[in-house]
Amino acid sequence: MWELLAKGDPEVYEIVMKELGRQEEGLELIASENFVSPAVMEAMGSTLTNKYAEGYPRRRYYGGCKFVDEAEQLARERVKKLFNCKYANVQPHSGSQANMAAYLAVANPGDTIMGMSLSHGGHLTHGSPVNFSGKLFNIVSYGVDLETEVLDYDEIERLALEHKPKIIIAGGSAYSRIIDFKRFREIADKVGAYLIVDMAHFAGLVAAGLYPNPVDHAHIVTSTTHKTLRGPRGGLILTNDEELYKAINKAVFPGIQGGPLMHVIAAKAVAFGEALKDEFKEYQMRIITNAKALAKELENLGLRIVSGGTDTHLFLVDLNPKNVTGKAAEKALESADITVNKNTIPKETRSPFVTSGIRIGTPAVTTRGMGESEMKVIAELIVKVIDNIQDEKGTIPEEIREEVKKAVHELTEKFPLYKDLT
């Protein structure tokens, strides 16, 4: 596939090949990562990358947009069908930019926004002080009940009544339970707030009908197009309100972006088309089954799972009982070709760069075709590594590392990833 790259720039080609090898040989358990289809990849590498197309279909600031208009319109129509909504903007370059545009469509800098605390499972763009959201807006954070580790809706309502936010954000990057969007909308209506749902992590589950559709309750829904949706890296915004749609479009362009990435939008259209097929629902069902099985097996082997389990594609592991940090666990596992990410947890006492937990997700290994029996093997390998961590650097005995790495490679060889890309 990359013959011209190999000939024209051997250095970049070598990097691409090394990354391909890493993905093929390793176990990818980062919850926000997945493997796109070759068709999605081809669309991203198409001639559409050459075209500037500021504006929207049939309302561009450049000529020659006849065919990119078709690509964007196709992406819009497919995603509207996928999520049963009236209006869609598929131009955001990322989930973060989708969130920024959604906020600026209905609020002004200095307004109050309520979002889930990062340490409780939220996202940087939900009000972190180091993010644009925390710098532009007055932030009120909510979280989970520290005993049950699930959302405390009564406390969320109390905070909303006290602070009267302009926006309430629901959704997160590390929350493993089903979110009650109906309750969130009731709270928002009580204080006259806009409800914005960030479904970036569970969009694929929503598309498959395995997670409540936030479009039914939210004023605005944002998402990435990768993660469980298994498309290219990018963002999207949905709404059923025509006036909000107009405001969203202005916020995206000319508000925060210039020319859209038409090659990525075409790849989004391909991914949405794939998600409309029956086999996509079966795939999403396997993701959840695998996540539940992996969490349960890890628990059986002595690890503590935050909130006691998962309803989705991901879960958090509390490493405090093991006296191991998330940073050390991430490094140790990566040395054995298992990738996870360190993650803050409720009652967090460590820095976000160290953390007390790790986040684990099953979309990527499910894409490879792995099932419950493989989750049992993976759990055993994870625990073997964690139980043998010797220091904060994530050092493990060489014989353990090589034993686990060998088992990982034997497993991934049975479930090849991209057969025709080398």
Curated annotation (Swiss-Prot):
Its EC number is 2.1.2.1. The record marks 226 as: Plays an important role in substrate specificity. The keyword Amino-acid biosynthesis applies. Pathway: One-carbon metabolism; tetrahydrofolate interconversion; Amino-acid biosynthesis; glycine biosynthesis; glycine from L-serine: step 1/1. It is found in: Cytoplasm. Catalyzes the reversible interconversion of serine and glycine with tetrahydrofolate (THF) serving as the one-carbon carrier. This reaction serves as the major source of one-carbon groups required for the biosynthesis of purines, thymidylate, methionine, and other important biomolecules. Also exhibits THF-independent aldolase activity toward beta-hydroxyamino acids, producing glycine and aldehydes, via a retro-aldol mechanism. It catalyses: (6R)-5,10-methylene-5,6,7,8-tetrahydrofolate + glycine + H2O = (6S)-5,6,7,8-tetrahydrofolate + L-serine. Keywords: Amino-acid biosynthesis, Cytoplasm, One-carbon metabolism, Pyridoxal phosphate, Transferase. GO terms for cellular component: cytosol. This is Serine hydroxymethyltransferase. It comes from the Bacteria. Homodimer.
